[in-house]
Regions:
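Conserved P-loop
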Residues: 2-86
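Short loop/helix-cap segments at secondary-structure boundaries that form the rim of catalytic
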Residues: 48, 137-142
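Phosphate-binding/switch loop-helix module in NTP-utilizing enzymes
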Residues: 69-120
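Loop/turn-to-beta-strand initiation segments
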Residues: 94-96, 124-129
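Short, polar loop motifs at secondary-structure junctions
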Residues: 132-136
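A short helix-turn-beta junction within AAA+ P-loop NTPase domains corresponding to the substrate/partner-engaging
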Residues: 142-150
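Conserved small/polar residues in nucleotide/adenosyl-binding loops
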Residues: 151-156
């Protein structure tokens, strides 16, 4: 089953981690791959302590992708794509695979839609979770459960006023 959490609202990763928790509650092995994140979140710190979870991420510069120079973008894209390749190679070991921010990696051209569609097709027996913004029509067409989280307000907006 393919779960897609997308949109400009907060909570996509949090919702995805709820599915991860459900799988862990059923003693299932889970792979969590974080694209464009450095793995330093509290959630990843917790998940790394769980014996049934494998977490993959790559060090990230303290810049958004669009702020990086060409050389840094190439290096970052290669390291992020290597995460996807590892997920492809090890997918059979897991009941559930979270590809966090994969939709953003697709939008930025770090991952190619054709390879993602092949991955999704090859892993229909698994719970696959994609998060991020702006999924393509082809990706959405593969989804079994699709949730769009919309931005309405943020406490930080109040603080900035």
């Amino acid at each position: 089953m393919l779960h897609i959490y997308h949109g400009d609202g907060k909570g996509k990763t949090t919702a995805a981690l709820g599915l991860v928790m459900r799988e862990l509650g059923h003693a299932q092995k889970v792979l969590v791959v974080q694209f464009l994140k450095d793995g330093k979140s509290g959630e990843i710190s917790f998940l790394k302590q769980q014996p049934l979870v494998t977490c993959l991420y790559s060090p990230m510069p303290k810049l958004f992708y669009y702020q990086m120079g060409q050389e840094m973008r190439v290096t970052t894209a290669l390291s992020q794509h290597a995460l996807f390749e590892t997920a492809e190679q090890t997918a059979a070991q897991y009941a559930c695979i979270l590809l966090d921010e994969a939709l953003d990696a697709l939008q930025l051209g770090i991952l190619q839609e054709i390879e993602m569609l092949a991955f999704l097709n090859a892993n229909k027996a698994r719970e696959i979770i994609l998060t991020g913004r702006n999924p393509s029509k082809n990706i959405l067409a593969c989804g079994d459960y699709i949730t769009c989280l919309l931005y309405t307000s943020d406490a930080a907006d109040e603080e900035d006023s």
